[in-house]
């Protein structure tokens, strides 16, 4: 039995709220149960030095957690003077996931920054960030089209992500913090709307997992991501 009484293949309640802030070209509050992440997309008319003069854009991401997004307060990374390895890993994952579905050549020399700030954490913050950031990116692209900054959408596909794992011997979908902290296996899966895998990150935390368990986790992830892709479409009115 899962602590939340969910079935093994059951997502937490997912909510995607668009236009959550007024300044960013795209902004979304995404909720996976008690995990809440604010995702904003900001358009900037310049690119990193390595892309200057190539008439190509860039999409990148930053990730952070508010000091009291968890059970006990933690210092801001800015106050500590450096980002943790975990933060760097997560924001690179978010950036890779979004770049997998955007044609950077259609952006011109512009950068879209995705900022994902965890307001409240209860497991699955990186996968919630990817799922919400895509919707914010979609809205930023809509802003660019409406303001004649670009002539056609650079988005090639949708992208969403979910966690899966083995908890008390059973493969389960969308782990919350209690499950994540006690699971035998933890895996994050990122997929596109057309069914392609962008990334699979899986680690045995306790007992090594067998091929059958891995196959079942991937089946659960695919099913969960299909639901998330539909949630994204509903939020975007597509």
From Swiss-Prot:
Q: Which E.C. number(s) belong to this protein?
A: 2.7.7.56
Record text on subunit structure and interactions: Homohexameric ring arranged as a trimer of dimers.
The biological process GO terms on file are: rRNA catabolic process; rRNA processing; tRNA processing
Q: What class of enzyme is it?
A: transferase
Which cysteines bridge via disulfide bonds? Answer: none
Q: Which stretches of sequence are listed as region Disordered? A: 64-86
* Name of the protein described by the UniProt record: Ribonuclease PH
UniProt cross-references to NCBIfam families, sorted A to Z: RNasePH
Similarity comment: Belongs to the RNase PH family.
One Pfam match, given by its short name, reads RNase_PH_C
Its function, per the record, reads: Phosphorolytic 3'-5' exoribonuclease that plays an important role in tRNA 3'-end maturation. Removes nucleotide residues following the 3'-CCA terminus of tRNAs; can also add nucleotides to the ends of RNA molecules by using nucleoside diphosphates as substrates, but this may not be physiologically important. Probably plays a role in initiation of 16S rRNA degradation (leading to ribosome degradation) during starvation.
According to the UniProt entry, its GO molecular function terms are: 3'-5'-RNA exonuclease activity; tRNA binding; tRNA nucleotidyltransferase activity
Fetch the InterPro entries from UniProt: ExoRNase_PH_dom1, ExoRNase_PH_dom2, ExoRNase_PH_dom2_sf, PNPase/RNase_PH_dom_sf, Ribosomal_Su5_D2-typ_SF, RNase_PH, RNase_PH_bac-type, RNase_PH_CS
Entry annotated with the keyword Nuclease: no
Catalysed reactions, as listed in the record: tRNA(n+1) + phosphate = tRNA(n) + a ribonucleoside 5'-diphosphate
- Where, by residue number, does phosphate bind? 86, 124-126
What does the UniProt keyword field contain? Nucleotidyltransferase, RNA-binding, rRNA processing, Transferase, tRNA processing, tRNA-binding
